[in-house]
């Protein structure tokens, strides 16, 4: 695409002569800017992109998109008050509005986004729809798989990923949509066909400032749905109705504890999985899955509901296929070589930890003990730290350790957590590797060990370095050294 085409009729002030020259790329990183690129000078958390516009021009940028005019730059400048909106607009235009050529499902909620997204994608594939995935663990763009640190990529990358999906002849995409991604405009200009709400509980208050603003951010996905789209909500969530009320799309519900369009009843759990019946339009459909726990029944229901609403067809066939689905990496993932059951899970919010501990406690023998290794991330919501302790001590014995401390003092984070304990059913070991060893060493064959918080992650972030750290590998190493 040429510069004059890209900038035609955009709501911005343009300084300099806009010529018909090819645009190679859009980028936020001045270091990666090359000849023919447009540099987006955004104000970030750590630095101001406007400070690097000169470097971008030296590297070959043909235009700068910013909220400020710089009289010392010799290239075209695109100046707008709403940089977020225009960045998303240009990204979509540059990649020829790829989301309009895909059936895009957006999944939002405090917990369960990754599992619901993965299950929905697998069900779509089973029904013959080549489907991409944008999510926490990986982005699947047809034959290409990308690992990224963001649940929802920035607007430029997201449109680029959609374009690659179209190029690979995919017809659908499932996107994990975080509240932060919504608030930062990362999914602006993405045309969603469906939205799924998993649940809403305490998270990301460090970013949003209040729980009310957190909910408002999540609602943006449902406001953006078209009238011919579908809004799928968990009716057991107290906020579900408010999401349906603000959405132009057709509302569909799923639930376990109350009436809904898709309702699960007769739930039974074991270490091998879950069985339940689904009530839909007066019929009963028996469902079995290798995924364990009530929270995973919700996840399965959400995936089934949205896929069935989009594709239609034989619901019984779709339900039957659920038995072949598996949980994403790091979601209540068992490690099979230990003296007692050991699970790794991404649970890093109070609700998520409660869900996982609840099901594992149900799998314990009467004289067994649940041993929980967990910490809390640094530079994130402080208020949930003592709440995590209260949840953990309800179910078992805790080994409190470090998660991703980031720029904070790990010992202070641990102190914040421990302020929530009302008993002495915990020990402290700030070194996560040693904490895992300690938990496994104290476990008896009738116990269960849960290593929570990091799940699929293969790194640990400290103030001055990021190290390789995989909970699963550390568990296996600990088992090899102990037994």
Swiss-Prot record:
It comes from the Bacteria. InterPro entries: Mur-like_cat_sf, Mur_ligase_C, Mur_ligase_C_dom_sf, Mur_ligase_cen, MurE/MurF_N, UDP-N-AcMur-Glu-dNH2Pim_ligase. Pathway: Cell wall biogenesis; peptidoglycan biosynthesis. Keywords: ATP-binding, Cell cycle, Cell division, Cell shape, Cell wall biogenesis/degradation, Cytoplasm, Ligase, Magnesium, Nucleotide-binding, Peptidoglycan synthesis. Its EC number is 6.3.2.13. Its main location: cytoplasm. This is UDP-N-acetylmuramoyl-L-alanyl-D-glutamate--2,6-diaminopimelate ligase. It comes from Chlamydia muridarum (strain MoPn / Nigg). The gene is murE.
């Amino acid at each position: 695409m040429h510069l004059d085409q890209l900038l035609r009729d955009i709501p911005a002030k343009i300084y300099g002569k806009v010529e018909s020259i090819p645009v190679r790329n859009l980028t936020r990183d001045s270091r990666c800017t090359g000849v023919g690129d447009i540099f987006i000078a955004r104000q970030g958390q750590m630095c101001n992109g406007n400070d690097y516009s000169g470097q971008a021009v030296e590297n070959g940028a043909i235009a700068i998109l910013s909220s400020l005019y710089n009289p010392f730059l010799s290239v075209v400048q695109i100046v707008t008050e709403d940089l977020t909106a225009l960045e998303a607009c240009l990204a979509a235009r540059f990649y020829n509005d790829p989301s309009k050529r895909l059936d895009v499902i957006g999944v939002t909620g405090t917990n369960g986004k990754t599992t619901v997204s993965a299950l929905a994608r697998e069900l779509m594939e089973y029904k013959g729809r080549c489907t991409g995935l944008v999510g926490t663990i990986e982005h699947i763009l047809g034959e290409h798989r990308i690992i990224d640190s963001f649940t929802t990529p920035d607007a430029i990358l997201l449109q680029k990923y959609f374009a690659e999906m179209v190029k690979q002849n995919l017809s659908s995409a499932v996107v994990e949509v975080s509240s932060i991604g919504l608030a930062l405009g990362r999914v602006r200009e993405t045309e969603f066909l469906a939205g799924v709400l998993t649940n809403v509980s305490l998270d990301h208050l460090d970013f949003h400032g209040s729980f009310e603003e957190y909910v408002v951010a999540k609602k943006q996905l449902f406001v953006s749905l078209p009238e011919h789209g579908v809004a799928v909500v968990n009716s057991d969530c107290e906020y579900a109705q408010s999401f349906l009320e603000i959405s132009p799309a057709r509302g569909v519900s799923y639930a376990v504890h109350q009436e809904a369009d898709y309702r699960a009843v007769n739930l039974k759990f074991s270490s091998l999985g879950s069985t339940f019946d689904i009530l839909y339009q007066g019929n009963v459909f028996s469902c079995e899955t290798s995924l364990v726990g009530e929270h995973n029944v919700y996840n399965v229901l959400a995936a089934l509901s949205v896929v069935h609403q989009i594709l239609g067809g034989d619901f019984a066939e779709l339900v039957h296929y659920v038995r072949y689905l598996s949980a994403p990496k790091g979601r209540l993932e068992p490690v099979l070589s230990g003296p007692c059951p050991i699970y790794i899970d991404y649970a890093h919010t109070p609700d998520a930890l409660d869900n996982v501990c609840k099901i594992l406690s149900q799998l314990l023998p009467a004289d067994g003990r649940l041993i929980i290794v967990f910490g809390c991330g640094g530079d994130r919501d402080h208020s949930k730290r003592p709440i995590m302790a209260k949840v953990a001590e309800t179910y078992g014995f805790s080994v409190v350790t470090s998660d991703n401390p980031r720029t904070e003092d790990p010992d202070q984070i641990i102190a914040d957590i421990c302020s929530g304990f009302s008993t002495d059913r915990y020990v402290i070991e700030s070194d996560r590797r040693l904490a895992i060893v300690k938990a496994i060493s104290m476990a008896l064959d009738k116990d269960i060990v849960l290593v929570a918080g990091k799940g699929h992650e293969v790194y640990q972030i400290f103030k001055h370095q990021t190290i390789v750290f995989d909970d699963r590998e550390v568990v296996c190493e600990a088992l090899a050294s102990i037994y």
